[in-house]
Amino acid sequence: MIVGRPDGRPLVVAHRGASVDRRENTVEAFEEAETQGADWVELDVRLSADGVLVVHHDAHFDDGRLVRETPADEVPDYVPNLAEAFEACGGMGVNVEVKNLPGDPDHDVSDQVCAAVAGLVAAYRPTDELLISSFDISAVDRIRGTDPTLPTGWLVVERHGTDLVLDRVVAHGHGSVNPWDELVDESMVVAAHQRGLRMVVWTVDDPGRISQLADWGVDGIITNRPELARRVIDGRLDGTWVDG
């Protein structure tokens, strides 16, 4: 489960790795994220035609092929499988985002990707260095149903109202809520923590906003710019950061 540092600093979570400086969701992006001081990496997984978890955001590769219809040995060279991605993330925690939304061209109603994720991740990270999330709450429900020890969180992008969202996360037994930055104010952070939830906000690259979220006590900040986020968060404590 994603937990902020003991000194109160939120964790820096590199969005698809150091995605400003390297190609997103690649071994190079994950390695660069650790070099830039990220605590965690967020990455996306989909299932190949032969049931291998591959790390890719979109349903299609750049050449137009559908990930779900492509065998693992035919995916582009830059696309790692999930096991390779875990290895590339070194000592960082990993937030695995499951991509299987209704309406996606590769949507699988049987949620085979969830079973595959649940069967693999525990071999690569202890639960305190792992979070599995999805925009589809039924996907993380399936993960939790397969292995209740795996930390899970719901990614939220729509404006349903704070109480409704947070109460739904609690009712489904998930430990984390991962809202879009534009939904977040201080009262939402307080309300989440009052319910015993962790909050991981995405995707934040503005230094002033990073500092504000840290002031509010969020547990993690997903960012495309881990080096910047690291400087802002650490500088708030030692007095070296000046906004603007």
Model-derived features: where do they sit?
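Short amphipathic alpha-helical segment that frequently serves as the phosphate-/nucleotide-binding helix
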Residues: 24-31, 44
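An active-site metal/cofactor-coordinating segment within enzyme catalytic domains
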Residues: 2-12, 35, 39-40, 45-92, ...
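Short loop-to-alpha-helix "cap/lid" segments that border enzyme active sites
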Residues: 2-7, 89-94, 98-244
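N-terminal beta1-alpha1 ligand-phosphate binding loop
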Residues: 32, 46, 223
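Hydrophobic transmembrane alpha-helices
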Residues: 18-20
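Functionally critical loop-and-helix segments that line ligand-binding/catalytic clefts
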Residues: 15
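Aromatic/hydrophobic pocket-lining residues that form the small-molecule binding cavity
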Residues: 26, 78, 82, 114
